[in-house]
Design a protein with these regions (language model features):
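Alpha-helical support elements that line or immediately flank enzyme active sites
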Residues: 422-449, 671-683, 733-745
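Terminal accessory carbohydrate-recognition/targeting modules of carbohydrate-active enzymes
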Residues: 2-14, 19-357, 361-365, 742-746, ...
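Extended, well-ordered alpha-helical scaffold segments
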Residues: 314, 318, 322, 329, ...
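General structural concept
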Residues: 21, 109, 115-124, 142, ...
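"… SH3/SAM/PH, and C2H2 zinc fingers" -> "… SH3/SAM/PH, FHA domains, and C2H2 zinc fingers"
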Residues: 12, 16-23, 138, 142-146, ...
Length: 824
C-alpha cells in the first residue's frame, strides 16, 4: 500500500471508532464536534506543504508564516556572457520557454512538472510528493531531472542550485558536516528545528550525472564532481531575493578568479560560476551542483515527528503511485465527453487542471491600503473622476497587516497573486476535484474581510508580491468592489450538499464511513452545514457592504422602477476604465456620471441574493431568506425596468442625459448578456430569446473561436487597448456554455436554439484553447476572435482552465429531451 493511502485509512478508522457504538449511526452533537475538529486537523496536515511559491518554477514551503522556504535555480554555463540572462528562478514571459507546467498534480499528493527551457537547451523535470506521518504536516520529497534538448550538445554544461531559507527568528537549519574544502562528495544533509515544524532533516542527494572538468589550475580548488554549499546570514526581508543574492556571491567569486589568474587565463565558465564551498551557520543555504549532459538528484525532507526518514526509494514508489492515482481520478472526475474523447484531449485536460491546482500558493505579508475615506471617493459629483484622481494623488495609503492568503492565481509569470474575481472561476474546476480544498481557499479569502465587509480585489502581500506590480496599481481602496464570484462556488457546494443531505436536517443524516478528505464536507452534510453556518455572517456582511457602497441612484432622477432599492453602480470609475468591474476598458456611458447604473453589477447582486437565500435556508434563517428573496425579486424586475432596451434587444448600462433624464447606452457585448450569463432569466422569458439571437449572430458576437467581448458592429470594436473590446475570454464563455446547457435542458420556447448554440460554442471554445496550447505550449489570457491565437499573458492557467469542465460537459448534439446529468 502506498504511504499516501494511509490518510484515507486513518480517516475511515477514526469515523468507525467514533460512531461504532451508535446502532442507528445518527450523529450526536458531541460526535459532530469531534469529527469536525479531526477533519480540520487532517485537512491542514495534508495541505500543509506544497509548491506554494507559484511565482517560482519550483519552490516548496508550508502554509505557515515566517517558516522554511525553498527554491530552485539553474542555468547553462558554457560561456561567460549568457549566464546573467540564463539563470531561471522566477517564472517569466520573456525567457523563451517552449512551455512549462504541471502535467499531473494533486494538491494533497504531489505531481510531475516539465519545464522545456529552450534558451538553456535543457528540459527540467520536477517530481514532487508528500508523504503523511507525524504531527507537522508529514514529509515531502522532490526529484530534479535534466535532459539536454535535441538541439543541445551532448556535453551541455548546466549548473543547478537549490536553496533553503529560514524566515523565523529562533529557527535553525544547520549542515551536519562541512565536507572538505572543495565540497561534498556524497549527499548533503541539514538538520533543522522550527517552532512550527518541530525537528526535521533535509537531504540533497549526490544524484546521477557526469560532471565537467578542465586542465586549469583552479581545478585543485573547484572540483565540479563535488556539491558545494554556501551559507549566509541575511535579514528576513531580503531572503526572497535569492537570485540577486546568488549573483552577488557569484560576482565575488568571479572577481577572485580574475584577481588570481587574470582575465587572459580565466578558467572555463563552468568553473568560474561555481560557488566556493563555505558551509556553516546561516538562514540561507545555497546548494550547488554542476553537470555535463543529463542529470538527476533528490531532495528529501523528513519530519522528525514522522518517525521515519524519507529515502529515494520512497520517492520513486510515491511518484509512481501518485501518477497512477491522478490519472485514474481524472478519468473519473473530468473524463472528456464527445467530441473530445481522443487521447490528445485527455492529456490537454490533465495539464489544464494540474496547472490550475499547481498555481495554488500561500502568501503572507502586508499590503498597501488607502483608508483616508476622502469625500471625493463617494463619487457623487459630476466630474467625480477628476476629484478622485486628485484624492489618490495625495498618497494617503499605508501598509496594513500582515495577512495570509491561501489561493490560486491567474498566471505564474505575470499575475502570481490572489485576485478576488478570478478566484471564483478558479475554484469551479477545483471544487469538482477537491471540494474540501476549495472550501479551505474560500475561507482564507473571507478571513481577509474587514469590519465593514470589504475584501481587497487584489491581494499583494509582502515585498516579493509587490515587486511584480507597478506602484500605481499596488494601492487598494476600501470603496472598490469586485465581482463576487466566490458565490458561484458556494452555490455549487450548497447544491451538492442539498443532494447529499436530502430533506434531513442537521444531526439526522447518516455519517459516511468511507469519507475521504477531498469530499468530507459533502459526504458528511453536518460538516458542510456547519461550514456554511460559520461563513454566513461574513457573506451577509459582504452583501450589505455592496448595497451600502455600490448603490445606484433611482430617486434623485425620478426613475420609474418596480423597486426603489435595487440599482447599482461600480465605484472606482475613470473615463476609460472601470477596473473594479473586472471588464476594465469595456465601453461605458460617456462622460461618466454619478447617475450611471451598471447592468453587470446589478446581475452580480441578483446572483448573490439568490445564493444567500439558499444558504440562509440551509442554516435555518427564514427571515433572512425572505430578505434575499425580496432583493432578488426587485433586481429581476428592475433589470427590465432600468436596463432593457427594446430597440437594441439587449440589456444596457444606464446614465442621465443632458435633460436630466434616464437613458440607456447600449454597447452590445458581454455586458448585454449578464442577466443571461448568471441565470437570472426564466426559460420562457422573451428577453432570453433576444439575447440568444444576439449571442448567435456572427455579425455581432458569435465567432468560430467563441463569443466576442464586444460586437463587431460596435464603433469601439478592437480599439485602443482592446482588452475587453473584441477578444474572446474563457470565463465569460464558460458562463454562457453553462447557461445554454441549462436552458437547452429546461422545456421552453428557446430550448432548441440554446441547444444548438451550446453544441457549437462548446466545440469552438475547446478547439480554440487546445489548438493554441498545442502550438505554443501555453494557455493564454484571451484569444483573438478572428484567428483564435492566444494573446496577452501566457501561462494563464487561471480561468482559462475552465476548459477542463467544458470538455467534461455532456455532448447534446444527439439530445432530444431525455434526462442527462446535472451540471454544477
Amino acid at each position: 500500500m502506498a504511504l499516501t493511502s494511509h490518510l484515507t485509512a486513518l480517516l475511515s478508522f477514526l469515523l468507525i471508532s467514533l460512531f461504532a457504538t451508535f446502532a442507528v449511526c445518527e450523529a450526536p452533537a458531541e460526535g459532530e464536534g469531534i469529527l469536525n475538529a479531526e477533519i480540520g486537523r487532517l485537512n491542514n496536515q495534508s495541505l500543509l506543504w506544497g509548491p506554494y511559491r507559484p511565482n517560482l518554477y519550483f519552490g516548496v514551503r508550508p502554509r505557515i508564516p515566517k517558516s522554511i522556504t525553498t527554491g530552485l535555480l539553474w542555468s547553462k554555463v558554457d560561456n561567460y556572457v549568457d549566464v546573467q540572462n540564463s539563470f531561471r528562478y522566477t517564472c517569466e514571459q520573456n525567457e523563451g520557454m517552449a512551455g512549462y507546467g504541471w502535467d499531473e498534480y494533486d494538491t494533497r499528493k504531489g505531481g510531475v512538472q516539465h519545464i522545456h527551457d529552450a534558451g538553456n537547451r535543457v528540459d527540467i523535470t520536477t517530481e514532487f510528493v508528500k508523504i503523511p506521518g507525524g504531527g507537522h504536516g508529514g514529509s515531502w520529497a522532490a526529484r530534479i531531472r535534466g535532459e539536454p534538448r535535441d538541439d543541445a550538445p551532448s556535453n551541455l554544461k548546466t549548473t543547478v542550485l537549490f536553496y533553503v531559507a529560514s524566515e523565523a527568528l529562533g529557527d535553525t537549519v544547520e549542515i551536519v558536516n562541512d565536507g572538505d574544502r572543495n565540497g561534498f562528495e556524497g549527499d548533503v544533509t541539514f538538520m533543522g528545528k522550527s517552532q512550527s515544524l518541530g525537528d526535521f532533516k533535509l537531504v540533497i542527494t549526490k544524484g546521477k550525472g557526469e560532471h565537467p572538468g578542465s586542465n586549469h589550475p583552479i581545478s585543485d580548488k573547484r572540483e565540479l564532481d563535488k556539491t558545494t554549499v554556501q551559507s549566509l546570514i541575511l535579514s528576513e526581508e531580503h531572503l526572497w531575493q535569492a537570485k540577486q543574492i546568488l549573483f552577488q556571491q557569484l560576482k565575488a567569486g568571479v572577481d577572485e578568479v580574475i584577481q588570481d589568474y587574470g582575465a587572459e587565463n580565466a578558467p572555463p565558465p563552468w568553473q568560474v560560476y561555481q560557488l566556493p564551498n563555505k558551509p556553516g551557520t546561516g538562514n540561507l543555504h545555497f546548494i550547488q551542483k554542476v553537470f555535463e549532459g543529463p542529470f538527476e538528484f533528490d531532495i528529501l525532507f523528513s519530519s522528525g515527528s514522522a518517525g521515519k526518514d524519507v529515502e529515494s526509494a520512497d520517492l520513486t514508489r510515491e511518484i509512481k503511485a501518485t501518477t497512477e492515482a491522478f490519472n485514474e481520478r481524472f478519468a473519473d472526475v473530468f473524463a472528456p465527453q464527445a467530441p473530445f474523447k481522443a487521447d490528445k484531449y485527455r492529456k490537454f485536460g490533465r495539464s489544464m487542471l494540474s496547472n490550475l491546482a499547481g498555481g495554488i500558493g500561500y502568501f503572507y505579508g502586508k499590503h498597501v491600503v488607502d483608508r483616508s475615506y476622502a469625500p471625493e471617493y463617494d463619487e457623487e459629483n459630476e466630474g467625480f473622476w477628476e476629484e478622485t484622481a486628485e484624492a489618490r494623488a495625495r498618497r494617503q495609503e499605508q501598509l496594513e497587516g500582515p495577512y495570509e492568503l491561501f489561493s490560486s492565481i491567474p498566471s505564474r509569470p505575470f499575475f502570481p497573486r490572489g485576485f478576488l474575481w478570478d478566484e471564483g472561476f478558479h475554484l469551479l474546476p477545483i471544487a469538482d476535484w477537491d471540494i474540501d480544498l476549495t472550501l479551505e481557499i474560500v475561507k482564507s479569502w473571507y478571513n481577509l474581510m474587514d469590519e465593514d465587509g470589504w475584501i481587497a480585489r487584489e491581494m499583494i502581500l509582502g515585498d516579493e508580491a509587490r515587486s511584480k506590480v507597478p506602484p500605481e496599481f499596488q494601492v487598494q481602496y476600501p470603496h472598490y468592489a469586485n465581482p463576487p464570484t466566490l458565490y458561484l462556488v458556494l452555490e455549487a457546494f450548497t447544491e451538492r450538499l442539498q443532494k447529499t443531505n436530502g430533506s434531513q436536517r442537521v444531526g439526522k443524516e447518516h455519517l459516511a464511513l468511507d469519507a475521504v478528505l477531498e469530499s468530507a464536507h459533502v459526504d458528511n452534510p453536518s460538516l458542510g452545514i456547519e461550514y456554511l453556518r460559520n461563513l454566513y455572517p461574513l457573506l451577509r456582511r459582504q452583501f450589505l457592504w455592496f448595497k451600502k457602497t455600490q448603490f445606484g441612484d433611482i430617486k434623485s432622477y425620478d426613475r420609474e422602477a418596480y423597486s426603489t432599492k435595487e440599482a447599482y453602480r461600480w465605484r472606482g470609475r475613470s473615463v476609460q476604465h472601470i477596473l473594479t468591474s473586472g471588464l476594465d476598458d469595456y465601453p461605458r456611458p460617456q462622460p461618466p456620471h454619478p447617475g450611471e447604473l451598471h447592468v453587470d453589477l446589478m446581475s452580480w447582486m441578483g446572483m448573490t441574493a439568490r445564493v444567500l437565500a439558499k444558504i440562509a435556508d440551509f442554516v435555518g434563517l427564514p427571515e433572512d431568506v425572505q430578505e434575499y428573496n425580496t432583493a432578488f425579486d426587485g433586481i429581476s424586475h428592475n433589470l427590465v425596468d432600468l436596463h432593457w432596451s427594446e430597440s437594441a434587444g439587449c440589456f444596457c448600462d444606464a446614465t442621465i442625459d443632458e435633460f436630466e433624464e434616464h437613458t440607456l447606452v447600449c454597447h452590445k457585448g458581454y455586458i448585454s448578456l449578464f442577466p443571461f450569463l448568471l441565470g437570472l432569466l426564466e426559460p420562457n422569458d422573451p428577453h432570453l430569446g433576444k439575447l440568444l439571437d444576439l449571442l448567435g449572430d456572427e455579425e455581432e458576437l458569435f465567432s468560430p473561436h467563441g463569443i466576442r467581448s464586444l460586437s463587431k458592429k460596435s464603433e469601439f470594436y478592437g480599439t485602443d487597448e482592446n482588452y475587453w473590446r473584441s477578444p474572446v475570454w474563457i470565463n465569460i464563455n464558460y458562463l454562457a456554455i453553462v447557461q445554454l446547457r441549462n436552458y437547452a435542458l429546461n422545456p421552453g420556447p428557446y430550448s432548441q436554439q440554446a441547444k444548438d448554440l451550446y453544441v457549437k460554442l462548446r466545440k469552438n471554445i475547446v478547439e480554440t484553447v487546445y489548438d493554441s496550447w498545442e502550438e505554443t505550449g501555453f494557455a493564454w489570457e484571451q484569444y483573438n476572435p478572428e484567428t483564435g491565437k492566444g494573446q496577452r499573458t501566457q501561462h494563464f492557467t487561471g480561468w482559462t482552465s475552465l476548459v477542463v469542465k467544458i470538455m467534461a460537459m455532456d455532448d447534446l448534439s444527439w439530445w432530444t429531451g431525455n434526462h442527462v446529468r446535472d451540471e454544477l
